[in-house]
Amino acid sequence: MGTSYRKLGYVLFLMLGMIVEEGIAYVRVKEKQSSPSFMGIYDESAVASDAVPCAEAGQSMLRQKGSAVDAAIATLLCIGVYNPQSSGIGGGSFMVIYDRSTRTPEVIDAREEAPAAATQKMFKGDKKLSSEGGLSIAVPGELRGMALAHERHGKLDWETLFQPAIRLAKEGFPVGSELAMALREQRSHILNSPTLKAVFTDPVSGDILKENDIVIRTKLGETLEKIAKNGADEFYEGQVAKDLINDIKSFGGIITAEDLKNYQPVLKNATVAHLSGCLTLYSVPPPSSGYILSFILRVLDKFHFSKASVSDIENATLTYHRFLETLKYAYAYRTKLGDERIENVSSVIAELTSEDVIEKTKQKIEDGKTYEPLHYGAQLATNDHGTAHISVVSREGDAVVVTTTINYWFGSGLRSPSTGVILNDEMDDFSAPDIQNIYGVPPSKANFIVPGKRPQSSTCPSIFVNKGGDVVMAIGASGGTRITSSVSLTSMRVLWLGRNIKEAIDEPRLHHQLLPDEIEYESKFPNEILEKLKAIGHKTKPAGAFGSLVVGIKRMKGGTLTANYDYRRGGSVDGSK
């Protein structure tokens, strides 16, 4: 008998499994949970999502014998409809694909990029211009990234993948709790944006939609139908492209028809890092943060953590101090990275991957001492924002992890009236030469705006594989600059501290990104440890309401899969027995 636990929520991270029996997903759920989320335990595969219709979208592809990539694409399209505050075809993505049969990973970089007319000083020192309105829009990459993945690994027809999202958009759906929250937080902006107001307000009251109100995205549904029929090029070169460009121009944007036509995703090698226990970590290269994650975990690996490392207050304080100091060194490197197609970041990558540098970094961490930011090599850090995440582990052992985003809530705050597409504000992820931080430290030149360049990202969708070639863990997160620290802390807890995937995700988190020089801590983090960290010299502040959210799949020693979503936003799990 099948069992499913579901809760609507903010799209963060999805786990898609490949096994169903006669269309029914089977699941065993661990009892006595410590949080509202459920850890599903499956013999072969799992599905977990915070958006019920979108988990169904992925499963419908699997029932039709689709590939893991097919399921991921269908789910991405669905969440772009269902959770417009965080994702959609007006944005971009990073995808890691692992082929079990050949034991090879690959990365598809479909990050948004700067238009040809973009310049370093286009915002004239006005931060608002980079985060709202037409100038904040970068060239979207999501659909061509999907198309490349489908061309290489898809089994079902392209048009088939769009059907669940099209139905959802045209028939409508109840506003979930997290979309409702985003609408409340952005109420003033929604009411003052004619293009968003047309979809997300009640025509009778004139106020924003509330939870369980029905939202219908007819125009977007029509656009998806055209792309389903004509292929991704419809968005980049067809009538949809023409309509989109006209709307962007009316918003004061500078993206041209040539910008759209010329956009291409980039097929890349995955980052590779070897950890103790004969594990290999595959993640995403610049402009994303896979090398930063690998650096963090390789340094931490040298401390030989175990369950005893958090067995009491003293040991736990030391462990978290070492973790925080490692983050500081890592985030200093992050500010030096940029789009490797344009910036020469080879020397930075060489340092991040050097065994000698890893060992020296470990040696520089002093157990009873912390320093000011410049000690770690601080430069101005950029902040990125909202994202959504998808992970797939198939029956065949293939894996796909994807991070997708339109950046801040509702992106640029602009919806194309002709197409229904909500447009990103990814230009805000670049550094600007005429904006310094509060420390007077200049911004990183490696992330300055250049036409055709892709901005830095904190995302690090990751796959861990054992020496036999089997996927051990597929993991990722949302939450801007907190993504890398959250994925590293959760991975550390699973790999070395004896936690299962649910315990690792549930436990309260710490974050440090070097600038500002303070620990962000969740409210449930033990106060005794915080006090001891402060005694060492760490500054602390409570984390805000919108931290990072992690979801992961972990394969146990016997081959059983365990999957969990982050209780901080809710979700669902399904799988096969």
Curated annotation (Swiss-Prot):
Keywords recorded for this protein, A-Z: Cytolysis, Disulfide bond, Hemolysis, Hemostasis impairing toxin, Platelet aggregation activating toxin, Secreted, Signal, Toxin
Tissue/organ expression: Expressed by the venom gland.
InterPro entries: GGT_lsub_C, GGT_peptidase, GGT_ssub, Ntn_hydrolases_N
Signal peptide start and end residues: 1-25
Predominant subcellular localization, coarse grouping: secreted
GO BP: glutathione catabolic process; killing of cells of another organism
Pfam families according to UniProt: G_glu_transpept
GO molecular function, one term: toxin activity
Record bears the keyword Signal: yes
Biological role: Dose-dependently induces human platelet aggregation on both plasma rich platelet and washed platelet (max. response at 3.2 ug/mL) and causes hemolysis against mouse and rabbit erythrocytes (35 and 65% respectively at 5 ug/mL). Does not show hemolytic activity against human erythrocytes (even at 100 ug/mL).
Protein name (database record): Scoloptoxin SSD14
Species of origin: Scolopendra dehaani
Organism taxonomic ancestry: Eukaryota, Metazoa, Ecdysozoa, Arthropoda, Myriapoda
